[in-house]
């Protein structure tokens, strides 16, 4: 797994400050390279974790085979194209098979681990669905992610408040429209 090289980050941040015409030794900026290095170590900590490891503990003795939904999971990530934040909520629904349940917090941890790396929203959505499908082997998985991207808010098109919504469906949710509709209605229910 990756280890953050804080010294390299500090050097690079100093160079960026100089490249934009700033004095990295002035008051207010002198500690910025160190602060940015510590911040990157934190916000990219998912690079040193395997998201599927969070799903290794199962409650296989349970006989629950009805829909499980964890919704409004807050997350933040960093767009790999511009290295600016995007943030929002993830919703995960799965239909357990054979009583293979995981702790609810484990689903949130999968999202956190995927989000804490240079990332694309589409990849978080797809990878979360694939990992849950592979590890829990449910009848189906549905993942919906909605986020605001600072690369659309702060620069370029400058559309603050716009949201991007992505979804990934696996298993029964691909074919059974009623099951998919039930999960989606529960996600949108206030």
UniProtKB/Swiss-Prot annotation:
Binding-site list for Zn(2+): 79, 82, 151
Xref: InterPro entries: GTP-CH-I_C/QueF, GTP-CH-I_N, GTP_CycHdrlase_I, GTP_CycHdrlase_I_CS, GTP_CycHdrlase_I_dom
Highest taxon listed in the record's lineage: Bacteria
Biological process per Gene Ontology, one example term: tetrahydrofolate biosynthetic process
Keywords attached to this entry: GTP-binding, Hydrolase, Metal-binding, Nucleotide-binding, One-carbon metabolism, Zinc
Annotated metabolic or biological route of this protein: Cofactor biosynthesis; 7,8-dihydroneopterin triphosphate biosynthesis; 7,8-dihydroneopterin triphosphate from GTP: step 1/1
GO CC, one annotated term: cytoplasm
Catalyses which reaction(s): GTP + H2O = 7,8-dihydroneopterin 3'-triphosphate + formate + H(+)
EC nos: 3.5.4.16
GO MF entries: GTP binding; GTP cyclohydrolase I activity; zinc ion binding
Record-stated family: Belongs to the GTP cyclohydrolase I family.
Subunit structure: Toroid-shaped homodecamer, composed of two pentamers of five dimers.
Protein name in UniProt: GTP cyclohydrolase 1
């Amino acid at each position: 797994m990756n280890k953050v090289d804080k010294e390299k980050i500090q050097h690079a941040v100093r160079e960026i400050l100089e490249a934009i015409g700033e004095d990295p030794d002035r008051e207010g900026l002198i500690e910025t390279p160190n602060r940015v290095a510590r911040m990157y170590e934190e916000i990219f900590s998912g690079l040193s974790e395997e998201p599927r490891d969070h799903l290794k503990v199962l409650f296989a003795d349970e006989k629950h085979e009805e829909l499980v939904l964890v919704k409004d999971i807050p997350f933040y990530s960093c767009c790999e194209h511009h290295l600016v934040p995007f943030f929002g909520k993830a919703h995960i629904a799965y239909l357990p098979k054979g009583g293979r349940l995981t702790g609810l917090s484990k689903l949130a941890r999968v999202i956190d681990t995927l989000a804490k790396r240079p990332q694309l929203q589409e990849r978080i959505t797809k990878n979360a669905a694939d990992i849950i499908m592979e590890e829990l082997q449910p009848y189906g998985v549905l993942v919906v992610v909605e986020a605001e991207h600072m690369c659309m808010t702060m620069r370029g098109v400058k559309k603050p408040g716009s949201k991007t919504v992505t979804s990934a469906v696996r298993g029964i949710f691909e074919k059974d429209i009623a099951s998919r509709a039930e999960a989606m209605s529960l996600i949108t229910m206030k």
